[in-house]
């Protein structure tokens, strides 16, 4: 399974082509739209979320509610484009029109300047349009397809925010994964402790008034994953490494960890290794899950526990010091429409990119021209792991 996304933040649309999905997977635009709606939610989102109401058009690869095995094309219209037709025009325009909304004051923390230098732009809008987090809508659409496939195999994903703008969320250790999912989905902040909602929302409101932004930490949890996905035989076959790359590819993400991650640097080996147990019903399992479901880059049958840290959004309404790229004189950075925080939405994106990588790994490992073929191969394999 592979995919490509295309499109700019204020262009006509975002387009994605997915290749390698088996035939016979039940799929509808409604399922994808539900995931896109989740991405647009959350407390702290900005004005654009009132403009865009993302809906996908499936233009190939699905017929009568099921995938055909052919490439799937997904198109998401940018409703805001109608206000940007000259600015984002494909055809050449007079210089006066081309200077409209020209960006020459790069924003610290964004791809504006590095993109301009790398690709030789005189207008940094070319960089910011493609590097915008708007592109993640396309990846969420891909993830929605992947989640449909995983669900057919009994693999489920969820996410919650564990740190919001420096505020650590108090999470009761007794909560089951299903309870975590339910509580996080009910929260505008994607947190599981409702008693902290007011405190954090008040903080977000103040940050917005200050013209500043907030980041935080998101955890994605995946259940139902069998032993043996990924491989240790080559460095680039390790599944946790593939997932780390995927999480780090999300806009504004600056770190990733599995299980207890960086905290293990302060612990002894006897405290973090997950002891092995066996039962007639389940086969091999672990007494704990400090390692987050991976050993040697291979899944060990435990739930996958993955955390990603998102930096505060770099577009500030009280802009920082920058430089005019035409005069090289000091200037305040450009201001584009932005959010004080997009952490809950980033959690949805992370959940979906994780689902995409897992679907790719499963489709590589198992025979999968059709969903019937894949389901049988997957079930036969999981039965084998229990008998081993």
UniProtKB/Swiss-Prot annotation:
Write the Enzyme Commission number(s) for this entry.
4.2.3.5
Alphabetically, the GO molecular function entries are: chorismate synthase activity; FMN binding
Q: What is this protein called?
A: Chorismate synthase
Q: Which family does it belong to?
A: Belongs to the chorismate synthase family.
Q: Which residues bind NADP(+)?
A: 39, 45
Q: Where are the transmembrane segments?
A: none
Name the enzyme's class. Answer: lyase
Q: Which PANTHER family match?
A: CHORISMATE SYNTHASE
UniProt keyword Lyase present: yes
Q: Which gene encodes it?
A: aroC
Q: Which cofactor does it need?
A: FMNH2
Mind telling me which GO cellular component terms the entry cites?
Answer: cytosol
Query: GO biological process annotations for this chain's record?
Result: amino acid biosynthetic process; aromatic amino acid family biosynthetic process; chorismate biosynthetic process
Q: Which UniProt keywords apply?
A: Amino-acid biosynthesis, Aromatic amino acid biosynthesis, FAD, Flavoprotein, FMN, Lyase, NADP
Pathway noted in the entry: Metabolic intermediate biosynthesis; chorismate biosynthesis; chorismate from D-erythrose 4-phosphate and phosphoenolpyruvate: step 7/7
Question: What is the annotated role of this protein in its UniProt record?
Answer: This reaction introduces a second double bond into the aromatic ring system.
Family matches, as NCBIfam families: aroC, PRK05382.1
Q: Name one Pfam family in it.
A: Chorismate_synt
Q: Which Gene3D superfamilies does the record cross-reference, listed alphabetically?
A: Chorismate synthase AroC
**Cofactor binding note:** Reduced FMN (FMNH(2)).
Its quaternary organisation is:
Homotetramer.
């Amino acid at each position: 399974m592979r995919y490509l996304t295309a499109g700019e933040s204020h262009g006509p649309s975002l387009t994605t082509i997915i290749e390698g999905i088996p035939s016979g997977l039940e799929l509808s635009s409604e399922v994808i739209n539900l995931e896109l709606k989740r991405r647009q939610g959350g407390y702290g989102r900005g004005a654009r979320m009132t403009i865009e109401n993302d809906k996908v058009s499936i233009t190939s690869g699905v017929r009568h509610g099921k995938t055909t095995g052919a490439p799937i094309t997904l198109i998401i219209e940018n409703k805001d484009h109608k206000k940007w037709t000259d600015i984002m025009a494909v055809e050449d325009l007079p210089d006066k029109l081309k200077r409209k909304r020209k960006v020459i004051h790069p924003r610290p923390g964004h791809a504006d300047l590095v993109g301009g230098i790398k690709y030789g732009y005189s207008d940094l809008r070319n960089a910011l349009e493609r590097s915008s987090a708007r592109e993640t809508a396309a990846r969420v659409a891909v993830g929605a397809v992947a989640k449909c496939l995983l669900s057919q195999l009994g693999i489920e994903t969820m996410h919650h925010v564990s740190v919001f703008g420096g505020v650590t969320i108090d999470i009761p250790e007794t909560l089951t994964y299903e309870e975590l999912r339910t509580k996080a989905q009910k929260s505008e902040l994607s947190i599981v402790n409702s008693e902290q909602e007011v405190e954090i929302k008040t903080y977000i409101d103040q940050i917005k008034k200050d013209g500043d932004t907030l980041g935080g930490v998101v955890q994605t949890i995946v259940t139902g994953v069998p032993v043996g996905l990924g491989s240790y035989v080559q460095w680039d076959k390790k599944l946790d490494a593939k997932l780390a790359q995927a999480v780090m590819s999300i806009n504004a993400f600056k770190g990733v960890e599995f299980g207890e991650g960086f905290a293990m640097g302060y612990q002894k080996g006897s405290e973090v290794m997950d002891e092995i147990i066996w039962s007639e019903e389940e086969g091999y399992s672990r007494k704990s899950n400090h390692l987050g479901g991976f050993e040697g880059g291979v899944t060990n049958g435990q739930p996958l526990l993955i955390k990603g840290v998102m930096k505060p959004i770099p577009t500030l309404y009280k802009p920082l010091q920058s430089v005019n790229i035409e005069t090289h004189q000091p200037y305040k950075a450009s201001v584009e429409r932005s959010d004080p925080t997009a952490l809950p939405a980033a959690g949805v994106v992370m959940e979906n990119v994780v689902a995409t990588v897992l679907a790719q790994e499963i489709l590589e490992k198992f025979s999968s021209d059709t969903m019937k073929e894949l389901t049988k191969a997957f079930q036969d394999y999981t039965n084998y792991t229990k008998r081993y």
